Amino acid sequence: MKIYSIAILRNSGNKALELCSAKDLSQFGFFERNGVSQFMTFFGETVAGRTGAGQRQSIEEGNYVGHVYSRSEGLCGVLITDKEYPVRPAYTLLNKVLDEYLVAHPPAEWRDIAQTSDQLKLRELEMYLAKYQDPSQADSIMRVQQELDETKIVLHKTIESVLQRGEKLDNLVDKSESLSASSRMFYKQAKKTNSCCLIM
């Protein structure tokens, strides 16, 4: 999973204008980087200009996906990722970046400008590009799911380690005093049913 670019654009008026961006071009060859960067800017300006206020859309192109979020204030965020990057964290990140940009730079600063300047940059954009390469950083639900998956892995390893010490689950079931006779019978019947489908 990879984020290649985060861009903030003004999409009110005749043509969209990139106000600031952060790009990670490390996976591209040295001589390709300038062209790739220009294409990302072109892509961002094109899709921002064609996305209505309040709309979100994801555009797939080859191995890349452009996630676009256009706000009613005339501001638009474009996140270019690979196909594996999840959609929900992408839009969570775009929403966060656009909120912070509007706090740092009210619309009066950028609404009527002809070209961008360094004063319109968002200093945290490079940090976000690095931090949110891991989508669980952007999405707390995804982070909780990842923690649950890790806990499940630990539980599986614990059960496997008990069984690897020479104990068999059948013996444990037979010795268990906490299982009723019907539970033991159910376990044995389920084991027989499942074993009939195995190819030896």
UniProtKB/Swiss-Prot annotation:
The keyword Iron does not apply. Gene3D superfamilies: 1.20.5.110, Longin domain. Residues 7-126 form the Longin domain. It is a lipid-anchor. GO terms for molecular function: palmitoyltransferase activity; SNAP receptor activity. It comes from the Eukaryota. One of its GO terms (cellular component) is Golgi apparatus. It is found in: Cell membrane. InterPro entries: Longin-like_dom_sf, Longin_dom, R-SNARE_YKT6, Synaptobrevin-like, V_SNARE_CC. CDD domains: Longin, R-SNARE_YKT6. The keyword Membrane applies. A lipid is attached at C197 (S-farnesyl cysteine). Keywords: Cell membrane, Coiled coil, Lipoprotein, Membrane, Methylation, Palmitate, Prenylation. The modification Cysteine methyl ester is found at C197. It comes from Eremothecium gossypii (strain ATCC 10895 / CBS 109.51 / FGSC 9923 / NRRL Y-1056) (Yeast). Belongs to the synaptobrevin family. It holds the Pfam family Synaptobrevin. Residues 140-200 form the v-SNARE coiled-coil homology domain. GO terms for biological process: autophagosome-lysosome fusion; endoplasmic reticulum to Golgi vesicle-mediated transport; intra-Golgi vesicle-mediated transport; intracellular protein transport; vacuole fusion, non-autophagic. This is Synaptobrevin homolog YKT6. A lipid is attached at C196 (S-palmitoyl cysteine). Residues 198-200 form a propeptide.
